[in-house]
Protein backbone atom coordinates (compact mmCIF):
# COMPACT_ATOMS: atom_id res chain seq x y z
CA UNK A 1 0.00 0.00 0.00
CA UNK A 2 1.52 3.23 -1.10
CA UNK A 3 1.88 5.83 1.56
CA UNK A 4 0.97 9.38 0.67
CA UNK A 5 3.82 11.80 0.96
CA UNK A 6 2.89 15.27 2.10
CA UNK A 7 5.42 17.96 1.26
CA UNK A 8 5.08 21.16 3.20
CA UNK A 9 6.26 24.28 1.45
CA UNK A 10 8.00 26.48 3.96
CA UNK A 11 9.23 29.97 3.07
CA UNK A 12 12.97 30.32 3.05
CA UNK A 13 14.25 32.02 6.14
CA UNK A 14 15.92 35.38 5.60
CA UNK A 15 19.63 35.31 6.10
CA UNK A 16 20.99 37.28 9.01
CA UNK A 17 24.29 39.08 9.05
CA UNK A 18 26.43 40.83 11.64
CA UNK A 19 28.68 43.81 10.79
CA UNK A 20 31.88 43.77 12.81
CA UNK A 21 32.60 47.42 11.97
CA UNK A 22 29.29 48.70 13.29
CA UNK A 23 28.90 45.86 15.82
CA UNK A 24 25.24 45.48 14.97
CA UNK A 25 23.02 42.91 13.28
CA UNK A 26 21.96 44.01 9.82
CA UNK A 27 19.90 42.98 6.83
CA UNK A 28 21.78 43.09 3.54
CA UNK A 29 19.45 44.00 0.66
CA UNK A 30 22.24 43.77 -1.94
CA UNK A 31 24.32 40.95 -3.35
CA UNK A 32 27.81 42.35 -2.73
CA UNK A 33 27.67 41.60 1.01
CA UNK A 34 28.48 45.09 2.23
CA UNK A 35 27.05 46.80 5.26
CA UNK A 36 24.45 49.44 4.29
CA UNK A 37 25.63 51.63 7.19
CA UNK A 38 29.41 51.75 6.82
CA UNK A 39 29.73 50.31 3.29
CA UNK A 40 32.36 47.85 4.52
CA UNK A 41 32.46 44.16 3.75
CA UNK A 42 33.50 42.97 7.20
CA UNK A 43 30.19 41.15 7.73
CA UNK A 44 29.43 37.65 8.95
CA UNK A 45 26.44 35.49 8.17
CA UNK A 46 24.77 34.35 11.38
CA UNK A 47 23.64 30.74 11.74
CA UNK A 48 19.95 30.05 11.58
CA UNK A 49 19.80 28.83 15.18
CA UNK A 50 21.57 31.89 16.59
CA UNK A 51 19.46 33.79 19.12
CA UNK A 52 17.89 36.89 17.66
CA UNK A 53 18.91 40.14 19.24
CA UNK A 54 16.28 41.84 21.34
CA UNK A 55 15.42 45.16 19.73
CA UNK A 56 13.24 46.41 22.57
CA UNK A 57 16.15 46.83 24.96
CA UNK A 58 18.26 48.84 22.53
CA UNK A 59 15.23 50.79 21.36
CA UNK A 60 14.31 51.74 24.91
CA UNK A 61 17.90 52.71 25.61
CA UNK A 62 18.03 54.89 22.51
CA UNK A 63 14.69 56.50 23.38
CA UNK A 64 15.84 57.23 26.90
CA UNK A 65 19.00 58.79 25.56
CA UNK A 66 17.02 60.93 23.14
CA UNK A 67 14.72 62.12 25.88
CA UNK A 68 17.52 62.99 28.27
CA UNK A 69 19.47 64.75 25.56
CA UNK A 70 16.46 66.80 24.57
CA UNK A 71 15.67 67.88 28.12
CA UNK A 72 19.25 68.95 28.74
CA UNK A 73 19.69 70.88 25.53
CA UNK A 74 18.82 74.46 24.76
CA UNK A 75 15.93 73.48 22.52
CA UNK A 76 17.72 74.26 19.27
CA UNK A 77 19.30 70.84 18.67
CA UNK A 78 18.23 68.16 16.24
CA UNK A 79 19.15 64.68 17.42
CA UNK A 80 19.69 61.58 15.34
CA UNK A 81 19.97 58.56 17.64
CA UNK A 82 20.74 55.15 16.23
CA UNK A 83 20.54 52.44 18.84
CA UNK A 84 22.50 49.27 18.37
CA UNK A 85 22.17 45.85 19.92
CA UNK A 86 21.78 45.10 23.59
CA UNK A 87 25.16 43.38 23.63
CA UNK A 88 26.81 46.66 24.55
CA UNK A 89 28.50 47.35 21.17
CA UNK A 90 28.71 50.79 19.58
CA UNK A 91 28.48 52.25 16.10
CA UNK A 92 31.98 53.16 14.92
CA UNK A 93 32.35 56.81 15.88
CA UNK A 94 35.44 57.32 13.74
CA UNK A 95 33.59 56.16 10.65
CA UNK A 96 30.68 58.47 11.44
CA UNK A 97 32.99 61.41 12.04
CA UNK A 98 34.80 60.79 8.76
CA UNK A 99 31.46 60.76 6.94
CA UNK A 100 30.59 64.17 8.37
CA UNK A 101 34.00 65.66 7.64
CA UNK A 102 33.88 64.30 4.11
CA UNK A 103 30.42 65.78 3.61
CA UNK A 104 31.26 69.21 4.94
CA UNK A 105 34.63 69.14 3.16
CA UNK A 106 35.85 72.15 5.08
CA UNK A 107 32.86 74.26 4.01
CA UNK A 108 32.01 77.36 6.01
CA UNK A 109 28.89 76.81 8.08
CA UNK A 110 27.47 79.48 10.43
CA UNK A 111 26.31 78.74 13.97
CA UNK A 112 26.97 75.04 13.71
CA UNK A 113 28.02 72.67 16.45
CA UNK A 114 28.28 68.99 15.58
CA UNK A 115 29.00 66.66 18.48
CA UNK A 116 29.49 62.93 18.20
CA UNK A 117 29.58 61.22 21.56
CA UNK A 118 29.01 57.73 22.91
CA UNK A 119 25.61 57.09 24.44
CA UNK A 120 26.64 54.87 27.34
CA UNK A 121 27.32 51.53 25.67
CA UNK A 122 24.32 50.98 23.48
CA UNK A 123 24.21 53.74 20.88
CA UNK A 124 25.83 56.85 19.51
CA UNK A 125 24.08 60.20 19.33
CA UNK A 126 24.70 62.86 16.71
CA UNK A 127 23.78 66.36 17.90
CA UNK A 128 23.25 69.00 15.25
CA UNK A 129 22.98 72.31 17.06
CA UNK A 130 22.66 75.87 15.76
CA UNK A 131 23.20 78.69 18.22
CA UNK A 132 20.73 81.38 17.38
CA UNK A 133 18.89 79.08 15.02
CA UNK A 134 15.17 78.48 14.92
CA UNK A 135 13.95 77.60 18.36
CA UNK A 136 12.44 74.21 18.84
CA UNK A 137 10.58 72.43 21.59
CA UNK A 138 12.23 71.50 24.88
CA UNK A 139 12.37 67.87 23.84
CA UNK A 140 14.72 67.00 21.02
CA UNK A 141 13.37 65.45 17.89
CA UNK A 142 14.86 61.98 17.67
CA UNK A 143 15.02 59.22 15.10
CA UNK A 144 15.64 55.90 16.82
CA UNK A 145 16.18 52.51 15.27
CA UNK A 146 16.99 49.82 17.81
CA UNK A 147 17.99 46.22 17.48
CA UNK A 148 18.17 45.02 13.90
CA UNK A 149 19.02 47.94 11.66
CA UNK A 150 16.81 48.38 8.62
CA UNK A 151 18.34 50.79 6.08
CA UNK A 152 14.94 51.56 4.56
CA UNK A 153 13.91 53.23 7.82
CA UNK A 154 17.07 55.30 8.23
CA UNK A 155 17.72 58.63 6.55
CA UNK A 156 21.11 59.08 5.00
CA UNK A 157 23.45 61.14 7.10
CA UNK A 158 24.14 63.61 4.31
CA UNK A 159 20.42 64.28 3.85
CA UNK A 160 20.02 64.99 7.56
CA UNK A 161 22.96 67.38 7.55
CA UNK A 162 21.78 69.07 4.36
CA UNK A 163 18.30 69.72 5.75
CA UNK A 164 19.76 71.08 8.95
CA UNK A 165 22.26 73.37 7.25
CA UNK A 166 19.52 74.80 5.05
CA UNK A 167 17.58 75.83 8.17
CA UNK A 168 20.48 77.75 9.71
CA UNK A 169 20.29 81.56 9.90
CA UNK A 170 22.49 83.80 7.82
CA UNK A 171 24.28 85.35 10.80
CA UNK A 172 27.98 85.00 11.14
CA UNK A 173 29.20 82.32 13.33
CA UNK A 174 31.20 79.47 14.60
CA UNK A 175 30.96 75.79 14.00
CA UNK A 176 32.58 72.87 15.73
CA UNK A 177 32.80 69.14 15.22
CA UNK A 178 33.66 67.37 18.47
CA UNK A 179 34.29 63.67 18.78
CA UNK A 180 33.75 62.31 22.25
CA UNK A 181 36.04 59.96 24.18
CA UNK A 182 36.98 56.96 22.12
CA UNK A 183 36.12 58.73 18.89
CA UNK A 184 39.69 58.63 17.70
CA UNK A 185 40.25 62.10 16.32
CA UNK A 186 42.67 63.14 13.66
CA UNK A 187 46.21 62.15 14.53
CA UNK A 188 45.15 59.52 17.00
CA UNK A 189 44.04 61.93 19.73
CA UNK A 190 41.05 61.35 21.93
CA UNK A 191 39.14 64.50 20.95
CA UNK A 192 39.19 66.36 17.64
CA UNK A 193 37.96 69.91 16.95
CA UNK A 194 37.23 71.37 13.54
CA UNK A 195 35.91 74.92 13.13
CA UNK A 196 33.96 76.44 10.26
CA UNK A 197 32.72 79.97 9.58
CA UNK A 198 30.43 81.44 6.95
CA UNK A 199 27.06 81.09 5.29
CA UNK A 200 26.09 77.65 3.94
CA UNK A 201 24.03 79.30 1.22
CA UNK A 202 27.24 80.62 -0.33
CA UNK A 203 28.65 77.15 -0.91
CA UNK A 204 27.83 74.11 -2.98
CA UNK A 205 26.60 71.15 -0.96
CA UNK A 206 26.59 67.87 -2.78
CA UNK A 207 26.85 67.07 -6.45
CA UNK A 208 23.76 69.04 -7.46
CA UNK A 209 25.09 72.21 -5.84
CA UNK A 210 28.40 71.89 -7.66
CA UNK A 211 26.61 71.33 -10.97
CA UNK A 212 24.58 74.48 -10.38
CA UNK A 213 27.69 76.59 -9.81
CA UNK A 214 29.44 75.19 -12.89
CA UNK A 215 26.33 75.87 -15.00
CA UNK A 216 26.18 79.47 -13.78
CA UNK A 217 29.86 79.99 -14.59
CA UNK A 218 29.42 78.60 -18.10
CA UNK A 219 26.42 80.86 -18.68
CA UNK A 220 28.46 83.88 -17.60
CA UNK A 221 31.29 82.93 -19.94
CA UNK A 222 28.92 82.95 -22.90
CA UNK A 223 28.21 86.66 -22.44
CA UNK A 224 31.83 87.67 -21.74
CA UNK A 225 34.81 88.15 -24.01
CA UNK A 226 35.57 90.50 -26.90
CA UNK A 227 32.69 92.22 -28.71
CA UNK A 228 31.37 90.99 -32.07
CA UNK A 229 33.09 92.00 -35.28
CA UNK A 230 31.20 94.39 -37.50
CA UNK A 231 29.66 93.10 -40.71
CA UNK A 232 31.87 95.46 -42.73
CA UNK A 233 35.04 94.01 -41.24
CA UNK A 234 33.76 90.48 -41.79
CA UNK A 235 33.17 91.22 -45.47
CA UNK A 236 36.70 92.61 -45.75
CA UNK A 237 38.26 89.28 -44.77
CA UNK A 238 39.75 87.91 -48.01
CA UNK A 239 38.71 84.68 -49.68
CA UNK A 240 41.54 82.41 -50.78
CA UNK A 241 41.75 79.04 -52.48
CA UNK A 242 43.46 76.00 -51.04
CA UNK A 243 46.46 74.85 -53.06
CA UNK A 244 48.09 71.45 -53.35
CA UNK A 245 50.82 72.26 -50.84
CA UNK A 246 48.28 73.08 -48.12
CA UNK A 247 46.41 69.87 -48.87
CA UNK A 248 49.62 67.86 -48.54
CA UNK A 249 50.26 69.52 -45.17
CA UNK A 250 46.88 68.26 -43.97
CA UNK A 251 45.65 71.70 -43.01
CA UNK A 252 42.26 71.59 -41.33
CA UNK A 253 39.57 74.00 -40.33
CA UNK A 254 40.04 74.37 -36.60
CA UNK A 255 36.32 74.75 -36.00
CA UNK A 256 34.84 71.74 -37.81
CA UNK A 257 38.13 69.77 -38.03
CA UNK A 258 37.53 68.86 -41.67
CA UNK A 259 40.47 68.67 -44.05
CA UNK A 260 40.60 71.33 -46.71
CA UNK A 261 40.24 70.22 -50.30
CA UNK A 262 42.19 71.54 -53.23
CA UNK A 263 40.74 74.67 -54.89
CA UNK A 264 38.32 75.07 -51.97
CA UNK A 265 37.46 78.67 -51.12
CA UNK A 266 38.08 79.61 -47.50
CA UNK A 267 38.47 82.75 -45.40
CA UNK A 268 41.99 83.82 -44.40
CA UNK A 269 42.31 85.94 -41.27
CA UNK A 270 45.12 88.50 -40.80
CA UNK A 271 46.88 85.96 -38.59
CA UNK A 272 47.02 83.58 -41.63
CA UNK A 273 44.65 81.03 -40.08
CA UNK A 274 42.19 79.49 -42.54
CA UNK A 275 38.54 78.65 -41.88
CA UNK A 276 35.44 77.67 -43.78
CA UNK A 277 33.19 80.64 -44.31
CA UNK A 278 30.19 78.98 -42.68
CA UNK A 279 32.41 78.15 -39.69
CA UNK A 280 34.19 81.44 -39.02
CA UNK A 281 31.39 83.90 -39.77
CA UNK A 282 29.12 82.73 -36.89
CA UNK A 283 32.11 82.97 -34.56
CA UNK A 284 32.97 86.50 -35.69
CA UNK A 285 29.37 87.52 -35.16
CA UNK A 286 30.00 86.84 -31.46
CA UNK A 287 33.74 87.49 -30.99
CA UNK A 288 36.16 89.72 -32.86
CA UNK A 289 39.15 87.42 -32.35
CA UNK A 290 40.73 84.45 -34.05
CA UNK A 291 39.50 81.22 -32.45
CA UNK A 292 43.06 79.83 -32.32
CA UNK A 293 45.49 82.63 -31.49
CA UNK A 294 42.92 85.13 -30.10
CA UNK A 295 44.36 87.91 -32.23
CA UNK A 296 41.99 90.85 -32.26
CA UNK A 297 40.46 91.64 -35.64
CA UNK A 298 38.70 94.82 -34.54
CA UNK A 299 41.76 97.12 -34.51
CA UNK A 300 44.79 97.52 -36.74
CA UNK A 301 47.24 97.89 -33.89
CA UNK A 302 48.19 101.45 -34.98
CA UNK A 303 49.11 103.33 -31.81
CA UNK A 304 49.75 106.57 -33.72
CA UNK A 305 46.16 106.70 -34.92
CA UNK A 306 44.92 106.17 -31.36
CA UNK A 307 47.14 109.05 -30.16
CA UNK A 308 45.75 111.40 -32.80
CA UNK A 309 42.22 110.45 -31.84
CA UNK A 310 42.94 111.35 -28.21
CA UNK A 311 44.47 114.69 -29.17
CA UNK A 312 41.51 115.56 -31.35
CA UNK A 313 39.15 114.72 -28.52
CA UNK A 314 40.87 117.08 -26.05
CA UNK A 315 41.30 119.92 -28.52
CA UNK A 316 44.19 121.74 -30.25
CA UNK A 317 45.51 123.15 -26.95
CA UNK A 318 46.58 119.72 -25.73
CA UNK A 319 48.18 119.03 -29.09
CA UNK A 320 50.18 122.25 -28.70
CA UNK A 321 51.26 121.14 -25.24
CA UNK A 322 52.50 117.90 -26.72
CA UNK A 323 54.58 119.76 -29.30
CA UNK A 324 56.02 122.03 -26.59
CA UNK A 325 57.04 118.97 -24.59
CA UNK A 326 58.79 117.55 -27.64
CA UNK A 327 60.68 120.83 -28.14
CA UNK A 328 61.77 120.86 -24.49
CA UNK A 329 63.03 117.32 -24.76
CA UNK A 330 64.93 118.20 -27.94
CA UNK A 331 66.54 121.26 -26.33
CA UNK A 332 67.60 119.23 -23.32
CA UNK A 333 69.16 116.61 -25.56
CA UNK A 334 71.19 119.25 -27.48
CA UNK A 335 72.35 120.97 -24.26
CA UNK A 336 70.51 124.25 -24.88
CA UNK A 337 70.13 126.29 -21.68
CA UNK A 338 67.59 128.72 -23.12
CA UNK A 339 64.62 128.47 -20.75
CA UNK A 340 61.30 127.82 -22.35
CA UNK A 341 58.25 129.82 -21.30
CA UNK A 342 56.48 126.55 -20.70
CA UNK A 343 58.88 125.78 -17.83
CA UNK A 344 57.59 128.82 -15.92
CA UNK A 345 53.87 128.47 -15.13
CA UNK A 346 53.32 132.21 -14.51
CA UNK A 347 55.14 133.20 -17.71
CA UNK A 348 53.23 130.60 -19.67
CA UNK A 349 49.95 131.90 -18.29
CA UNK A 350 50.90 135.51 -19.15
CA UNK A 351 51.91 134.64 -22.69
CA UNK A 352 48.78 132.62 -23.08
CA UNK A 353 46.74 135.65 -22.12
CA UNK A 354 48.57 137.84 -24.66
CA UNK A 355 48.43 135.39 -27.54
CA UNK A 356 44.80 134.45 -27.05
CA UNK A 357 43.00 137.61 -25.89
CA UNK A 358 39.75 136.58 -27.58
CA UNK A 359 39.64 133.10 -26.04
CA UNK A 360 36.35 131.99 -24.58
CA UNK A 361 36.64 131.92 -20.72
CA UNK A 362 34.47 128.82 -20.51
CA UNK A 363 36.63 127.13 -23.15
CA UNK A 364 39.77 128.16 -21.28
CA UNK A 365 38.42 126.77 -18.02
CA UNK A 366 37.55 123.53 -19.75
CA UNK A 367 41.07 123.21 -21.19
CA UNK A 368 42.89 123.29 -17.84
CA UNK A 369 44.83 120.10 -18.43
CA UNK A 370 47.77 118.75 -16.45
CA UNK A 371 50.72 117.90 -18.66
CA UNK A 372 53.61 115.71 -17.54
CA UNK A 373 57.11 115.30 -18.84
CA UNK A 374 60.25 113.80 -17.37
CA UNK A 375 61.24 116.78 -15.21
CA UNK A 376 58.26 119.12 -14.82
CA UNK A 377 54.56 119.21 -14.21
CA UNK A 378 52.68 122.34 -15.14
CA UNK A 379 49.09 123.47 -15.62
CA UNK A 380 48.04 124.94 -18.91
Curated annotation (Swiss-Prot):
The keyword Transferase applies. Signal peptide: none annotated. It catalyses: S-ubiquitinyl-[E2 ubiquitin-conjugating enzyme]-L-cysteine + [acceptor protein]-L-lysine = [E2 ubiquitin-conjugating enzyme]-L-cysteine + N(6)-ubiquitinyl-[acceptor protein]-L-lysine. One of its GO terms (cellular component) is cytoplasm. Its EC number is 2.3.2.27. Pathway: Protein modification; protein ubiquitination. Residues 50-92, 317-367 are annotated as: Disordered. A zinc finger (RING-type) spans 253-294. One of its GO terms (molecular function) is ubiquitin protein ligase activity. Keywords: Metal-binding, Transferase, Ubl conjugation pathway, Zinc, Zinc-finger. The keyword Iron-sulfur does not apply. One of its GO terms (biological process) is protein polyubiquitination. Residues 55-68, 74-89, 338-350 have a biased composition (Low complexity). 'Iruka' means dolphin in Japanese. The name was chosen because dolphin preys on the Argonauta octopus, similar to Iruka 'preying' on the protein Argonaute. E3 ubiquitin-protein ligase that mediates E2-dependent, 'Lys-48'- and/or 'Lys-63'-linked polyubiquitination of substrates. Recognizes miRNA-empty Ago1 and triggers its degradation via polyubiquitination independently of the Bag6 complex. By targeting miRNA-empty Ago1, eliminates dysfunctional Ago1 not able to bind miRNA and thereby plays a role in the quality control of miRNA-mediated silencing. Interacts (via N-terminus) with CG7546 (via Ubl domain). This is E3 ubiquitin-protein ligase Iruka. It comes from Drosophila melanogaster.
Amino acid sequence: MAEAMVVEDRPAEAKRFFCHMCNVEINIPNSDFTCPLCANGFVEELPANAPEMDSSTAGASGSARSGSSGSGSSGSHDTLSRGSSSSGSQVNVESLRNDIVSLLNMRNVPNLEITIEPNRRHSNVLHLGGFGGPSGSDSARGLTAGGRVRPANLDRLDNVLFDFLQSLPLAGATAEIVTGPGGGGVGGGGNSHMFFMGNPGDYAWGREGLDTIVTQMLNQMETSGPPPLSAQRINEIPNVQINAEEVNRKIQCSICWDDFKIDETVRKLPCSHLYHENCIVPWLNLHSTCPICRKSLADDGNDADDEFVMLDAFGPEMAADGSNSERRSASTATGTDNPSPANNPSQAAAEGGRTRPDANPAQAARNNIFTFDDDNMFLD
